[in-house]
């Protein structure tokens, strides 16, 4: 008997004048849209974070929250600063001042058995990276010692993986929380990593909604350079007197769907660094140097990630200073103390 074809409902934000490609709005995930290379909007009256969109795919509408000062409207009705309205298919969203018209489209997408199998394989890699990264921004009042997150279990006792949408949601909430912010300007915000893997570990995030390195183009080049410069500024401002060495870079396959630059000291002295995947996500080619990413975009117009990259998370533990192999994380940490004199 043939296997039933699974279907899923997806939502798209579509610019009516077709100035750019449609933007996918994942189910129940907050997506911030505004002035950016992605939307092709350069009007300074449109904030870089003009609206927050959250698709209710099962119910067939999108919640729109106006975040910018200037008015966003749905069918000529102004939403209002920090207010929220529903956007239904057939209605027109004007991003700011009655300009830049958008509509939403919902469609049923059939998944073939082969696609489902590929997605399961990809999900395995995602869950490995999710465990490797596990960070969204430091919660108020927390400290590096507060790193444990109790895994959720179902009634049979099986551990449930946190969904990609949940992590992304937490990251975007952290970006907007003044208590989380270390630095911000009109292009980026810097927050502390919620689960720091070293004494100093920050995330530099653009306000513009850029889902991953996969969608980065030459149009984002200046933003990438600015993110790098801000990372160096944060090091100078908050660890300038430290003798610690730092690296700036991106995870090749991030667990959170919003581009973020890691700024991390190389002591790796943190109780949050708990397993091989944590270590290898920062100490193999899984970690893409910021300057290398910038060079790649300069020369090729995009970022290329090698096939099989997620397998790097399974490599043996190796000291990043002297290349000695260590059998376990506790022994690696003990070994690292010899390098930083702890």
Swiss-Prot record:
Keyword DNA-binding: yes
Compartments, record wording: Nucleus, Nucleoplasm; Nucleus, Nucleolus
Domain of life: Eukaryota
Endpoints of the signal sequence: none
Principal EC category: hydrolase
A single Gene Ontology CC term: nucleoplasm
Site-annotated residues for Interaction with DNA substrate: 174, 251, 262, 277
Positions with biased composition (Basic and acidic residues): 151-164
Active site: 260
Organs and tissues of expression: Widely expressed. Expressed in heart, liver, kidney, spleen, lung, muscle, brain stem, spinal cord, cerebellum and brain.
Entry remark concerning the domains of this protein: The histidine triad, also called HIT motif, forms part of the binding loop for the alpha-phosphate of purine mononucleotide. The FHA-like domain mediates interaction with NCL; XRCC1 and XRCC4.
Record's protein name: Aprataxin
Species in which this protein is naturally found: Mus musculus (Mouse)
């Amino acid at each position: 008997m043939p296997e039933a074809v699974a279907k899923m409902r997806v939502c798209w934000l579509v610019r009516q004048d077709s100035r750019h490609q449609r933007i996918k709005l994942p189910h129940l995930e907050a997506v911030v849209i505004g002035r950016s290379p992605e939307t092709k909007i350069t009007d300074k009256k449109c904030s870089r974070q003009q609206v927050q969109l959250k698709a209710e795919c099962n119910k067939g509408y999108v919640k729109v929250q106006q975040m910018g000062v200037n008015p966003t409207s749905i069918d000529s009705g102004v939403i209002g600063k920090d207010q929220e309205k529903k956007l239904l298919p057939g209605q027109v969203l004007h991003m700011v001042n009655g300009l830049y018209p958008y509509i939403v489209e919902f469609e049923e997408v059939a998944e073939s058995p082969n696609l489902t199998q590929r997605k399961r394989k990809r999900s395995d890699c995602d869950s490995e990276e999710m465990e490797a990264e596990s960070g969204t921004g430091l919660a108020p009042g927390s400290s590096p010692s507060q790193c444990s997150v109790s895994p959720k279990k179902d009634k049979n006792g099986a551990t449930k993986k946190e969904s990609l949408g949940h992590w992304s949601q937490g990251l975007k909430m952290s970006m907007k929380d003044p208590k989380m912010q270390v630095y911000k300007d009109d292009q980026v915000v810097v927050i502390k990593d919620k689960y720091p893997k070293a004494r100093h570990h920050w995330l530099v995030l653009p306000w513009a909604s850029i889902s991953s390195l996969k969608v980065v183009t030459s149009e984002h080049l200046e933003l990438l350079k600015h993110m790098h410069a801000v990372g160096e500024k944060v090091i100078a401002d908050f660890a300038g007197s430290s003798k610690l060495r730092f690296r700036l870079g991106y995870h090749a396959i991030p667990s959170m769907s919003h581009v973020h630059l890691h700024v991390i000291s190389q002591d790796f002295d943190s109780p949050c660094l708990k397993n091989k995947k944590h270590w290898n996500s920062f100490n193999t080619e899984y970690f893409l140097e910021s300057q290398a990413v910038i060079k790649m975009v300069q020369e090729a117009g995009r970022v290329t990630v090698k096939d099989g990259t997620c397998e790097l998370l399974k490599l043996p533990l190796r000291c990043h200073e002297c290349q000695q192999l260590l059998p376990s994380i506790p022994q690696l940490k003990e070994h690292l103390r010899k390098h930083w004199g702890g």
